[in-house]
From Swiss-Prot:
Binding site for Mg(2+) 2: 81, 85
Residues at which Mg(2+) 3 binds: 205
GO molecular function: (2E,6E)-farnesyl diphosphate synthase activity; dimethylallyltranstransferase activity; geranylgeranyl diphosphate synthase activity; metal ion binding
Organism name: Colletotrichum higginsianum (strain IMI 349063)
Binding annotation for dimethylallyl diphosphate: 90, 168-169, 202, 209, 219, 229
Applied relevance: Diterpenoid pyrones display various biological activities and higginsianin A shows anti-HIV activity.
Alphabetic keyword roster: Magnesium, Metal-binding, Transferase
Taxon lineage: Eukaryota, Fungi, Dikarya, Ascomycota, Pezizomycotina
Biological processes annotated in GO: alcohol biosynthetic process; mycotoxin biosynthetic process; terpenoid biosynthetic process
Signal sequence residues: none
E.C. number: 2.5.1.-, 2.5.1.1, 2.5.1.29, 2.5.1.10
SUPFAM superfamilies attached to this UniProt entry: Terpenoid synthases
Binding site for isopentenyl diphosphate: 42, 45, 74, 91
Protein name as catalogued: Geranylgeranyl pyrophosphate synthase dpchD
Cofactor: Mg(2+)
Length: 322
C-alpha cells in the first residue's frame, strides 16, 4: 500500500470524528476568542460600517457578512497584540492568554483569521479575496514595524509613525469600507476618509493611554510606557529634545513602577507633547470633516451621523474605542 493510500483513509476518519464531536471541539478551539468576544466593547467598527452604509446602501445580509469578517479579524489581532505587548488587562479584565495560555490563544487567533476568510465567498465577488489579502498584509506590515521600533529602541519620525498607523490601524477600517464598496452601486471612493479616520483613532488611543482614567481602568495606567511603545506623544516628546535621554531610557526599562510612569507623563507634558496630540487631532478632524462636506449629493442626515462618529473618535466624550 502506497503512503498516499495510507494517509487518505486516516484523514477521512479524522474528518468524520471532528464532525461527530464538532461542537465540543469548536468550543475548546475558540475558547480564548469567545472569552474576548464576551467582554463588553464599544463596537466602534460596527457603528462606522452602519454609518457608511447610509452612503453605500449595500444589502443588509452582505453588511452583516462584512461585520463578521471585521469582528473576527479585529479580535484575532487583539489576542495577538496582548501577547506581543505583554498586556495584563483587556477591557478591564485579564487578557485571554493569562487564562488559556499563550499557545492556545495564538491558535485561536489564527483560527479566527481563517474563520473570517471563510466568510469571503458569501460576498459573491472575486475581488473580495484580493482586498482581504491586501489589507491583512498591510495590517501585519504595520504591526511588524511597531514591534521592531519597540524592541530595537528606535524612535521613528512622525511621518514613519503615520505610515505604520495607516497600515496597522487603518487596515481594518479600509478592509471594511473597500468590501462594502465592492457590494455597492456607488462609485465614490471613501478610502481617503477612512485613512484619516484610522489616524484619528490611533492618535487618540495613544493620547488616552497616558491621560485617561477610563483607559487606566480598562488597560492599566500608562501601559504604553510599560510596553516600551513609541506612541505619538512619546515620539514627539523624545524628538523635541534628543539630548535628554530620560524618556527613552524609561521605555527601555519596561517599567511597571507607577511613580516612574508618573514622572514620564510629567516629562511628556513638559515638552508640550499632549498639546501637540490635541492640535494634531483637531487638524485630522478638520481634514475628515472637509472630506465629508465636500461629498456632493449626500443627505444632511448622513453628514450628521458621520460627524457624530467623528466626534466619538475625537477628544470629546469618554469613549475608549478598544
Amino acid at each position: 500500500m502506497s503512503p498516499a493510500e495510507i494517509i487518505r483513509p486516516a484523514a477521512k476518519v479524522q474528518l468524520m470524528d471532528s464532525k461527530a464531536h464538532g461542537n465540543n471541539h469548536e468550543e475548546i478551539i475558540r475558547a480564548p476568542l469567545n472569552y474576548l468576544l464576551d467582554l463588553p466593547g464599544k463596537e466602534v467598527r460596527s457603528k462606522l460600517m452602519s454609518a457608511f452604509n447610509q452612503w453605500l446602501r449595500i444589502p443588509e445580509e452582505k453588511l452583516e457578512v462584512i461585520k463578521r469578517i471585521v469582528m473576527l479579524l479585529h479580535n484575532a489581532s487583539l489576542l495577538l497584540d496582548d501577547i506581543q505587548d505583554s498586556s495584563t488587562l483587556r477591557r478591564g479584565l485579564p487578557v485571554s492568554h493569562s487564562i488559556f495560555g499563550i499557545a492556545q490563544t495564538i491558535n485561536a487567533a489564527n483560527y479566527a483569521f481563517f474563520l473570517a476568510q471563510q466568510e469571503i465567498p458569501k460576498l459573491e465577488d472575486p475581488r473580495a479575496f484580493e482586498v482581504f489579502t491586501e489589507e491583512l498584509l498591510n495590517l501585519h506590515r504595520g504591526q511588524g514595524m511597531d514591534i521592531y521600533w519597540r524592541d530595537a529602541s528606535i524612535c521613528p519620525t512622525e511621518e514613519e509613525y503615520f505610515t505604520m498607523v495607516s497600515n496597522k490601524t487603518g487596515g481594518l477600517f479600509r478592509l471594511a469600507v473597500r468590501l462594502m464598496q465592492l457590494a455597492s452601486e456607488s462609485d465614490r471612493d471613501y478610502v481617503p476618509l477612512v485613512n484619516v479616520m484610522g489616524l484619528i483613532f490611533q492618535v487618540r488611543d495613544d493620547y488616552l493611554n497616558l491621560q485617561s482614567t477610563a483607559y487606566t481602568k480598562n488597560k492599566g495606567f500608562g501601559e504604553d510606557l510599560t510596553e516600551g511603545k513609541f506612541s505619538f506623544p512619546i515620539i514627539h516628546s523624545i524628538r523635541s529634545n534628543p539630548s535628554n535621554i530620560q524618556l527613552s531610557s524609561i521605555l527601555k526599562q519596561r517599567t511597571t513602577d507607577v511613580d516612574v510612569k508618573l514622572f514620564a507623563v510629567a516629562y511628556i507634558e513638559s515638552t508640550g507633547s499632549f498639546e501637540h496630540c490635541r492640535k494634531t487631532l483637531a487638524e485630522l478632524m478638520a481634514q475628515a470633516k472637509a472630506i465629508i462636506e465636500g461629498m456632493e449629493g449626500d443627505s444632511s442626515e448622513s453628514l450628521s451621523v458621520m460627524n457624530q462618529i467623528l466626534t466619538m473618535l475625537g477628544l470629546d466624550g469618554n469613549e475608549v474605542p478598544r
